[in-house]
Structures are given as structure tokens and as C-alpha cells.
Swiss-Prot record:
Its cofactor is Mg(2+). This is Actin cross-linking toxin VgrG1. It comes from Vibrio cholerae serotype O1 (strain ATCC 39541 / Classical Ogawa 395 / O395). Mg(2+) 1 binds at E727, Q873, E1050. Its EC number is 6.3.2.-. GO terms for biological process: actin filament depolymerization; isopeptide cross-linking via N6-(L-isoglutamyl)-L-lysine. Coiled coil: none annotated.
Length: 1095
């Protein structure tokens, strides 16, 4: 039978000073808890005895020590560490009892607490700094994944050991220890493959008992439990605002459990796909670390946390495999150490352990990240000699007062974003904090690694522009000249009687007014120009002065007119000169000088009759006054709504207000009391019911075709969210266009409000649809659809009479429907006649939208939005001719679309500054438009799962367009791609310009999206792929009868599998008569009745 023995050595003591009575210890992969105390890899409580009775803490605490285990006098295991705690117990006749706690040197980091900043360093580099600062040089990394530099990593009010554990857990690192003579090495790994393995397998012995010389394992229990099956993380980066950063990782070995246990978290604490994928897998490994575990016992001292071993001789062959020791408890007793004091019994050793299968990776428990519980003060810093230091995003560097390690320069922090009062696409407000400014810093989600500047403050050194409180009534915007003296200022004085707006420009003042300027001065105006003053007016200039006009020049005054100068006075005109006055006309003149009056001409007539010449006279218009301020509107008093009106609102499914029980009792006698109907289901908010002002429509109701006197408004950028599956992906006008014809009938002038669609199909029917409240475009099953079919009469587009008839019929139908919508307490649509003879439908705040599927076209301004009869399609486009110098109207609308990135034009100009392009402006416009399409396609492909990289259109004989994407061979294909061929767009460029445009598109994709996605999107278009819609507006190049080229960008929001849930239009009447017959009064009355019964 094997004999066991234990001994211990402590730095500075003789080897035989202490004898081991017993020990109890725990080891674990990374940190754990042992006997209520933190265990940083290992922790042993060792019971000792010594003949020396006066050992002190100075001799023991913080000293190196080594516990050794012997079998048959051979050293088989050692535990090296430092003494964390030492205690003295009873004093006997021969021995004094002691106890010490043996821990790794790593535990020293738990005694340091700090706040500091690390920049552009990997986690292994940061951990190395922490260890080396504590004099720990025995450490090693065995990592499968390359460390990624962290731009900004903050240790914030936490101990060094907590900081180390937090970073290690985030990166999936675990640590264990390798014990050697005189040292223990801290060993970091991120995969089970990197762990050390015992050289010999360990046998399993199910029948404990008898004398067995070799160590063995017994009591092994294997446990499987259901855990999280999928992890999904999400984050955001301002550098890629449209990119979702969504990462999904599915677990493996899930046959025994359901796969619906998803763990979602945001933010995921990553800013790129590489880290996102790694962090998601690490999170899943941690959440599933208890899915497959085993526990057991043994007498093998070689078993240690962080080691692998092979098990053999188990009755279940599946258990004879490799295992990883996750944690293990060791117990040893050595009574013979006190033999002289009566100690007896055999020396024993045993352990209890926890395992995972060798192919799995153990992950440490993520440590909570310190939260910054409020704003901080910091100072803006930068290089010496600079006043303003920022990057292309307007970010600055800052220094925190608590940061003891930085020098207060440009290396003190990462680039920190600055909150601005208004931030749009190349518009808004920008004020860069300057070096030395004090700023208020907050942290996104309380994360110390994500600071953002949200405010600025004055202090004792940086004082306000004007002293306070003397100038407390001033509101001031004052800047300071960069690298010079002076300032610009706009200030407002609000002291009663001293109100003033003050504007100061240190150098130049430039102004540009694109249209009119109206200025009114109700008292004096003084203008002093110390150098030149020039004024140019291309039209007329009128100067009207009720008093006197005095003009004085120091030298010469010249008045020159192309046709006439007319001088007129009510009483007299005096022209005075010191030496000479000359009046000259043609070859004749009158000259007055000190020598006399000289008349010269072909003929001089005196009192010869005739009449004097006349001038044009004053004909200028008086200046217009500027618009006044709108007076404040008083709040309207509370409105009482009758119970009958509330009932009407309920029947119309229009939320109003809750019915008052007292009002209900007053409105209805108690004998015939009516229980108010239950409130309607939650729906998009609508206007409360109002008294119906419009009369019922008559059989002779005709559309209002009067000439519009309203100025054309700016086209809004609101698109109905409730009926589109993609939220806010498209903004613009709600319009319809002819799907297969060149005929243009009109356009929707403006549209606002959450719209429910009223559509017409093939110009033959009107469909009133009332969708329910939708959630992300889902729940299409419950649409309520009512349809009135007029005729099934075809109309050729080249039949002008038939086209005109259909237009009038659709106009009448629209008018009739809008009247009914108004009766449901909604603002009506007002068809009016446009200047070019086409009708216009204005939608100013309606809850419904009318469109004629083949009857209304958005030719105006080049903007096109299409609604198909099922309400699932929307298209926006711009005329191809709109690119270039004459593109202002079209591009103005195009640039309002959220997917269009206007800044790409200036980027292209910068990228091609050294290239000789034939038409730089046209190329920049094409580049911006195409790149916007490429980027939007990549974004939607990533967001909605368009797998354009999983199929080859050519090999499958599928046309690469939206119809091809609906092919069953394409997986999960949402039809959300723009339809147009880049080759058609670049045809308007020269070959060299087209080549330059295409060359610079791909890097734009790669800078925002993954390499694979960028490659596939780019290749898709290069292979001739077009994207949803009607091609290039069904235009045939070179055909003079073909419609004008229009480049379309279409979104289809209903996937194929949801088509069956769309509303089914049911006709209430069918007729084979021509449209013209519908204007027959009797038939018109029939249709009206049908509409009324439905609506």
C-alpha cells in the first residue's frame, strides 16, 4: 500500500520548522468562492505545528511558501504561493499550533483599487501591465484568438483583480496555475485545446474498497440540463449608424432540449463584426457552461483545475474520454506529524471535482462593469501650441481630474464625441470645444468606456463674455479668433428700454439670400463705410424718401443710364458748378462757364414753337413690409362631447374620449338605458369626432376643378409607418404611377399624417381599406376591405378620348370617396386643377390616402412613389436627366430620401481631385446616387436577410431582379432591393468618368460593411443585377414614344409567405358597360348607395 506524506517550506524559515497536520484547499479555472472567501485560482488552508512557539506574522505573512505532497517518498505534487494570512493556536507540551492561508501572488491585485485609462492596447497587454506593476512576471498567454486593440478602456473605481477578471471574461479568457519549484506561473487560455493534459489516463473504480496502489476515480456523475440555446447581441456605432451590428450564435448539441431559449442583450459592447461574433460566442459558451457537467471523487493528487485528462475503464464507453477539470477540492490529513503528542492514524488524501467534456470551453462568469452614476467634469486637451484640436467627426480629447497617469495632452483620452444642439445631414449646429474648455461628460448606458460631451461650463479662469450679474439680461454667442486676436459675436440685450441685437464680425461678413429680403426700420438708420461700397441690382431699384435726400461726394459723381435720366422737382431744379456746366445732346451743347454762355448746334431755335421733352416719371412700387409675428393663441376651453357623438365615434372605430357615466344617463332615459359599447381596440390615433359640416353628396356631385392659387409647398418627408413593414425606411410623397403606360395624369401635391390606403385597381374600382394597428408590418390577417368596382372596360393609352373619360371617372370617384371620408370626421382630399391641365390631390392632414393604381403619376419634380392595389409596394425615383447642372428640382427631392447620402458628392470630389474628369458635377451626382443604392442594398440585406450571396442568377437561369429573388430557390428573400441597372445609369457618363465612378464605390461599401457582404452586393450589380420596381420605368431607350427615363428605388415589404394574409378584394357590383355610362345619373346613384352602405 502506498504511503503518503506532506511538508511545507516558507521563505526565510528552516525546512523543518513547520510540519503539516492537514490541509483543505480548492482550485478553480479563474475565480470562485471557497469557505466564504474569494478564491483566485487556488486557496489552501493549511494546519501546522512547530516546536517554535514564537513565530510571528513578520516571519510569515506575504512570504512565499510551498506545500509538497509525497507518495512512497516520491514528490508527486506541489502548491506554490504566498502566505495571505497566518494565525497562532494552542501551545502544547511540545508543539505550537499554527494555520496559514496559501494563495497565488495574483491575489495581491485584490488589495489595489484604481481609476485610470488604457488606450489602443489589447487585453493581454493591459493584463500584463497590471501583473508587472505587482511584480508578477511569471505569467503566460496561450490564445487562439488574436487580441484586438481597445481604443479606450477604463478601469473605473475598481480593484485591479476585478478589472482583470472583467476584461478576461469579456475576451473569453480563463486562468489557471502551473506549479514548479520555487514559483507558480499564471496561465491564461481561451480554449480547452490550450490546456495541459496529464500524461497518463486515470482509471475508474466503481467498487471502492480493498487495497489499490494506483490512484483512481470513483463516484462519477454526469449531468445534462437545459440552458440557453441561442445568443443574440446588438450594438451601435455612430460611424455606421445604419448598420445593425446584430450577431446571432446558435448552440450545438441541442437534441435533448428545445431551441427557443434565446438570450438577447444590447448593447453588446462591441463596434465591429469581428468582436461581435467573438463576444456572442463567448456569451453563449458562458450561458451553456452547465449544460454538460460531471462531478466525482478521487485520490489522484495530479488532478488540478485547468488540466485535462483521459478517463478509462468506465462501464459506460461514452464516459471514457477526455475531460477538463473546472474545480477541485483537496483534503489531506497527516496525524503522524504529532506522534510524540499522541497523534496516530494513517496519512490520507482525497479530492472532489467538477468536470466538463474536453471539447467544450469553460468561460468565467462576466463581471459587472462599473457604472458611472452621473456626469463628470473634464478639460479639453490637445497638442502644445494648438487652440482647437478635433477630428473629422468633431470629436475632441479630454482629461479627467481623477486621471493621474496622463499628461493632459492629446494622449489623455480617446476621441470623444460632442453633443450638438442640432445635427442633420450636412446641416445643423456645430461648436467645437477648444483646448482648455471645461466640459460636462456623460457616459452612454453608464459605460465608462463610452464618454460623450453633453455640456460646457465656465469656471474661475474661463469667465463669461460679459461680467455677471451686471449683464444678466444679455444672451451672447461670442467666438474667439483662432491663432489671432479678436472675436465674432451675436448678442441680445433684453433689458427693458435697452433691447438690442448686436452683431460683430472680426473680419468679413458675408450673406446670401436665395429669394426675398424684407427689412423695416421704424426709426433711424446709420451706415458708415470706411472704404469702398458697391451695389449691383440686376432688376429695378426704387428709392422713395418722404423727406430730403442729401448726397455728397468728395470727388466725382457719375450718373449713367442706358436710356434716360429724368430729373423732376415740384418747384425748382438748381444745378450749380464752380467752373463749368455743359448740357450735351448729339452734336449740340450748351456750355456755361465764367466766360459766358455758349450754344452750339446745327441750328439754334428761339421761341420757335414745339414742346419740351418729357421723362418717364416715378413709377416704382413701394417696398413690401416684412411679415409680422403670429400672436400667441390662447388654449381652447374644454369641449363637451355628447354621448351620441361618442357612440358615432365608436361605430366608426374612431377613438375619442372615455364616456362619462353621468352623461350617458342624461342622454338616455333610464327606462331604455343603453350600455355604452366597449372601447375600440388600440389603433393609430385619429382626430376626435367633430360636427359634420359638409352636406351629403348628391347624384350630381362633381369634383372641384378650380385653379389652385396656393404656392407649391415643400414636399414633406413623412411616409405612413403603420402600413409598411420597414419602419421609416422610405420617406417622400404618397403617389401612384401608371404601371405599364406612358400616360401621365397628375400627382399628389403634398401628404402628411399616418395614412390608411384607399386604392384603385386597374382604373376600374375603388378600394377602401382599413388595416388594424400593425406591429412592424405584421398582422395583415385582419384588414377590412370594401370595394366598389365600376367597370371591366379596357382602355388603350393611345385612345385620347378613352383616356380622358377614365381620368374624369377616376377624379369623380376620388371626390366621392373623399367626401365620405370627411363624414367620418377626417379632412377631405381636395382635387384641384393644375396649371398644366392635370389634376392635383392635396393631402394636408388626412388619415386616409387615395391613389389610382394606373391613374395618377408623380411626374412632378421627378419624384415617384407607387402604391400597388395590395398596398405593399412603394417606389421613389428621379428622372435620369436630372443629373447635372439642371438637376436642382429633381435632386432636391431625391436628397430628401433618408437612404440618399448627399455627403458622398463632396467625398467623390475629394477622391477625384487629381483626376481629369469630363463632367465632375455629373459624375459626382451619379456616384452619390449609385453608392447610396449600394449601401442601402447592403444595409437591408443585412437587416432583413436577403441572401444575395447564396445564389447565382445566371446558373439558375433566373433574371437577376426582384422576380428572380422571389424564386423558391432563394432562401428567405424579402423583396427589399432597388430595381435599376447601374449600367443604365452610368451610360449618361463618358467611359472614363463611368470607370472613375465605379472604381470608388467598392471602398465605400467595404468601409461600412463586412468584406463578404460588400463583395456580394458589388458583384451582384456588376453582373447586371437590377433591383425591384419597373426596370427603368419601362422605358425603351431610343423610343420617342417611350416614357421619360426614371431611375427607381423600390421597397416591397410583404414577403412571399405573407401574401396569403393580404386583404382579398371582393367586388360588390360588376358591369360590362363603358366608363362613360357610369356618369348616367341613375347608375351613379346606384354606385353612391353602394359606397354609402360600405363606408
Amino acid at each position: 500500500m502506498a504511503t503518503l506524506a506532506y511538508s511545507i517550506e516558507v521563505e526565510g524559515l528552516e525546512d523543518e520548522t513547520l510540519v503539516v497536520r492537514g490541509f483543505h484547499g480548492q482550485e478553480s479555472l479563474s475565480n470562485s468562492v471557497f469557505l466564504g472567501q474569494a478564491c483566485y485560482g487556488f486557496r489552501y488552508e493549511v494546519q501546522l505545528a512547530s516546536r517554535v512557539s514564537n513565530l510571528t506574522a513578520e516571519q510569515m505573512v506575504d512570504k512565499r511558501a510551498e506545500l509538497k505532497l509525497y507518495r512512497n517518498s516520491q514528490l508527486v505534487q506541489r502548491v506554490h504561493g504566498i502566505v495571505r494570512a497566518f494565525s497562532q493556536g494552542d501551545i502544547g507540551h511540545h508543539h505550537t499550533f499554527y494555520q496559514l492561508t496559501l494563495v497565488p501572488a495574483l491575489e495581491r491585485l485584490s488589495l489595489r483599487h484604481n481609476s485610470r485609462i488604457f488606450q489602443k492596447q489589447t487585453v493581454p497587454e493591459i493584463l500584463s501591465i497590471l501583473l508587472q506593476e505587482m511584480g508578477i512576471n511569471d505569467y503566460a498567454f496561450a490564445l487562439k484568438r488574436d487580441g484586438v486593440q481597445r481604443e479606450f478602456c477604463v478601469q473605473y473605481r475598481e480593484s485591479d483583480i476585478d478589472f482583470l477578471h472583467r476584461l478576461a471574461a469579456e475576451e473569453g479568457l480563463v486562468y489557471s496555475f502551473v506549479h514548479e519549484a520555487g514559483k507558480h506561473t499564471l496561465y491564461f487560455s481561451d480554449a480547452s485545446d490550450s490546456l495541459s493534459k496529464l500524461p497518463e489516463p486515470i482509471p475508474y473504480n466503481a467498487l471502492v474498497g480493498g487495497a489499490i496502489d494506483t490512484p483512481y476515480i470513483h463516484g462519477l456523475t454526469y449531468r445534462t440540463q437545459a440552458e440557453v440555446s441561442e445568443v443574440q447581441l446588438k450594438d451601435y456605432s455612430f460611424k455606421k449608424p445604419a448598420y445593425s451590428f446584430l450577431q446571432t450564435v446558435q448552440g450545438t448539441e441541442l437534441d435533448y432540449q428545445q431551441t427557443r431559449y434565446q438570450h438577447f442583450d444590447a448593447p453588446g459592447r462591441y463596434k465591429d463584426d469581428v468582436n461581435g461574433a467573438a463576444f456572442s460566442q463567448i456569451r453563449l459558451d458562458y450561458l451553456r457552461r452547465h449544460a454538460h457537467t460531471a462531478t466525482g471523487q478521487s485520490n489522484e493528487p495530479l488532478l488540478r483545475a485547468g488540466y485535462k485528462f483521459d478517463l478509462q475503464e468506465h462501464l459506460d464507453p461514452a464516459m471514457n474520454r477526455d475531460w477538463v477539470v473546472v474545480s477541485i477540492n483537496h483534503q489531506g490529513e497527516q496525524p503522524q506529524a504529532l506522534q510524540e503528542d499522541g497523534g496516530s492514524g494513517a496519512t490520507t488524501y482525497s479530492n472532489q471535482f467538477s468536470l466538463i467534456p474536453g471539447h467544450l470551453h469553460w468561460r468565467a462568469e462576466p463581471q459587472p462593469k462599473p457604472q458611472v452614476d452621473g456626469p463628470m467634469i473634464a478639460t479639453v486637451v490637445g497638442p502644445e501650441g494648438e487652440e482647437i484640436f478635433c477630428d473629422e467627426h468633431g470629436r475632441v480629447k479630454i482629461h479627467f481630474p481623477w486621471d493621474r497617469y496622463s499628461n493632459g495632452n492629446e494622449q489623455s483620452s480617446c476621441w470623444v464625441r460632442v453633443s450638438q444642439g442640432w445635427a442633420g445631414s450636412q446641416y445643423g449646429f456645430i461648436a467645437i470645444p477648444r483646448i482648455g474648455h471645461e466640459v460636462i461628460v456623460e457616459f452612454l448606458n453608464g459605460d465608462p468606456d463610452q464618454p460623450i460631451i453633453t455640456g460646457r461650463t465656465y469656471h474661475a479662469t474661463n469667465t463669461p463674455p460679459y461680467t455677471l450679474p451686471e449683464h444678466k439680461t444679455k444672451t451672447v454667442l461670442r467666438t474667439e479668433t483662432h491663432q489671432g486676436e479678436g472675436f465674432n459675436e451675436l448678442s441680445f440685450e433684453d433689458q427693458a428700454g435697452k433691447e438690442q441685437i448686436y452683431l460683430h464680425a472680426q473680419k468679413d461678413f458675408d450673406g446670401l439670400i436665395e429669394n426675398d429680403q424684407f427689412t423695416q426700420i421704424k426709426h433711424n438708420q446709420h451706415l458708415t463705410v470706411e472704404w469702398e461700397s458697391r451695389e449691383a441690382v440686376t432688376g429695378e431699384q426704387v428709392l422713395s424718401i418722404e423727406g430730403s435726400l442729401h448726397v455728397k461726394t468728395g470727388k466725382v459723381r457719375v450718373n449713367e443710364a442706358g436710356t434716360e435720366i429724368h430729373v423732376k422737382a415740384g418747384q425748382k431744379v438748381v444745378i450749380e458748378a464752380g467752373s463749368e456746366i455743359t448740357v450735351k445732346a448729339g452734336g449740340s451743347f450748351v456750355k456755361v462757364d465764367p466766360a459766358g454762355v455758349h450754344l452750339s448746334g446745327a441750328l439754334v431755335n428761339l421761341n420757335s414753337g414745339g414742346s419740351a421733352g418729357s421723362g418717364s416719371g416715378f413709377g416704382g412700387a413701394m417696398p413690401a413690409l416684412p411679415g409680422g409675428l403670429e400672436p400667441a393663441v390662447a388654449l381652447a376651453p374644454p369641449q363637451t362631447i355628447s354621448y351620441q357623438a361618442l357612440l358615432q365615434a365608436e361605430q366608426a372605430n374612431v377613438p375619442a374620449v372615455k364616456v362619462c357615466p353621468l352623461a350617458a344617463q342624461e342622454a338616455t332615459p333610464a327606462v331604455n338605458s343603453i350600455t355604452p359599447p366597449p372601447p375600440p381596440p388600440i389603433a393609430p390615433p385619429m382626430a376626435p369626432p367633430q360636427p359634420i359640416m359638409n352636406p351629403q353628396p348628391t347624384a350630381n356631385a362633381q369634383p372641384n376643378l378650380g385653379r389652385s392659387t396656393k404656392a407649391t409647398p415643400d414636399f414633406p418627408t413623412h411616409f405612413p409607418k403603420s402600413s409598411i413593414g420597414i419602419e421609416n425606411e422610405l420617406a417622400g410623397l404618397v403617389v401612384a404611377m401608371p404601371a405599364n403606360s406612358a400616360q401621365k395624369f397628375g400627382y399628389v401635391k403634398s401628404a402628411q399624417g399616418d395614412a390608411l390606403f384607399m386604392l384603385t385597381k386597374d382604373m376600374n374600382q375603388g378600394s377602401y381599406q382599413r388595416p388594424p394597428s400593425l406591429q412592424d408590418g405584421k398582422n395583415y390577417q385582419n384588414w377590412q376591405t370594401h370595394t366598389v368596382e365600376l367597370v371591366s372596360y379596357p382602355c388603350e393609352m393611345d385612345d385620347k378620348a378613352a383616356v380622358e373619360t377614365r381620368k374624369q371617372a377616376m377624379l369623380w370617384l376620388a371626390t366621392h370617396f373623399t367626401t365620405h371620408i370627411d363624414q367620418s370626421n377626417h379632412q377631405p382630399l381636395a382635387p384641384i386643377q393644375s396649371e398644366d391641365g392635370r389634376f392635383v390631390i392635396e393631402i394636408t392632414n388626412a388619415k386616409h390616402v387615395i391613389a389610382a393604381g394606373n391613374g395618377i403619376s408623380a411626374e412632378s419634380q421627378g419624384q415617384t412613389i407607387t402604391m400597388t392595389p395590395s398596398g405593399q409596394q412603394a417606389t421613389v425615383g428621379v428622372a435620369a436627366k436630372g443629373f447635372g447642372t439642371s438637376a436642382t428640382p429633381e435632386l432636391r427631392l431625391l436628397e430628401s430620401a433618408p437612404w440618399y447620402q448627399k455627403s458622398l458628392k463632396s467625398q467623390f470630389a475629394s477622391l477625384t481631385s487629381a483626376e481629369n474628369l469630363d463632367d465632375k458635377e455629373l459624375a459626382a451626382n451619379v456616384f452619390a446616387y449609385l453608392t447610396s443604392i449600394y449601401l442601402k442594398t447592403a444595409e437591408l440585406a443585412k437587416k432583413f436577410g436577403i441572401y444575395i450571396n447564396e445564389w447565382d442568377p445566371m446558373s439558375e437561369q433566373i433574371t437577376p431582379n426582384a422576380n428572380g429573388l422571389t424564386d423558391p430557390k432563394v432562401k428567405n428573400a424579402w423583396e427589399i432591393l432597388p430595381r435599376t441597372k447601374p449600367s443604365k445609369i452610368v451610360e449618361i457618363l463618358s467611359k472614363s468618368d463611368a470607370k472613375a465612378v465605379m472604381k470608388h464605390i467598392k471602398p465605400q461599401l467595404q468601409s461600412r460593411y463586412s468584406e463578404s457582404l460588400s463583395k456580394n452586393v458589388f458583384q451582384y450589380f456588376q453582373d447586371g443585377g437590377e433591383v425591384a420596381g419597373h426596370g427603368i420605368n419601362n422605358a425603351t431607350v431610343g423610343d420617342k414614344h417611350s416614357p421619360e427615363l426614371a431611375i427607381l428605388f423600390e421597397f416591397r415589404t410583404v414577403p412571399n409567405e405573407l401574401q396569403s394574409y393580404l386583404p382579398k378584394t371582393e367586388s360588390t357590383t360588376k358591369s360590362e358597360v363603358k366608363l362613360l355610362d357610369q356618369f348616367d345619373p341613375m347608375k351613379r346613384k346606384t354606385v353612391i348607395q353602394q359606397v354609402e352602405s360600405l363606408v
